[in-house]
Amino acid sequence: MDRYVLRGGERGADRLGLLADADGGATSAFWDRAGLAGGAHCLDLGCGPGAVTVALARRVGPAGTVLAVDRDDVAIELAKRRMAAAGISNVSYAVADAYDFVATDEFDFAYSRLLLHHLSRPAEVLQRMWEAVRPGGVIAVDDVDFDGAFCHPPDDGFSFWRDRYAQVVRHHGGDPTLGRTLV
């Protein structure tokens, strides 16, 4: 995978947890539209410390499973602790780079959230996700278009942050406007 430009591991876990909490309703509605049901076998690619993985595991219930994958071994350990604290036992884990992850026809639902815009070759990861789902399975990608980020009333500090974040993502090979290309 290309360089993740935000702080990960333990220092980034709180930020990702807050983001998951803030977006929880939208994420659930997205999963509704994608047809995610109880009992599904899911891939959570780029799971980070597992803030969204908790919701995914609860959504599929005890008859379903989630494989949480991230290249950051510290994030995987944090995800394991988060699942244990939540009493969730239907999640397994793998430390793997999104480019190198290999699975064939194993999942009903392959999910990625806020990962692809960091990558210089997102089509390769989408191909990996495609290969991982069973025939009739679903690939669901939740990502951003930072050109759509705004603040009202306008704020110079916010605009500075948005523009610098986009520059850093581009500098490391990503595309901060990738979200607009997803269907």
What are the functions of these language-model segments?
Residues 3-23:
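Class I SAM-dependent methyltransferase Rossmann-like catalytic core
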Residues 21-41, 55:
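Conserved alpha-helix/loop element of class I SAM-dependent methyltransferases that forms part
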Residues 43, 49-100:
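Class I SAM-dependent methyltransferase SAM/SAH-binding core
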Residues 61, 119-120, 133-134:
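Helix-to-beta-strand junctions that scaffold the AdoMet/dcAdoMet cofactor pocket
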Residues 100-109:
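A short acidic, Gly/Pro-enriched loop at the edge of an enzyme's catalytic core
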Residues 108-122:
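A short SAM/SAH-binding and catalytic strip from SAM-dependent methyltransferases
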Residues 123-138:
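A short glycine-rich, Lys/Arg-flanked "PGG" loop and its adjoining helix->strand segment in the class I
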Residues 140-183:
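Conserved catalytic/acceptor-binding region of the Class I
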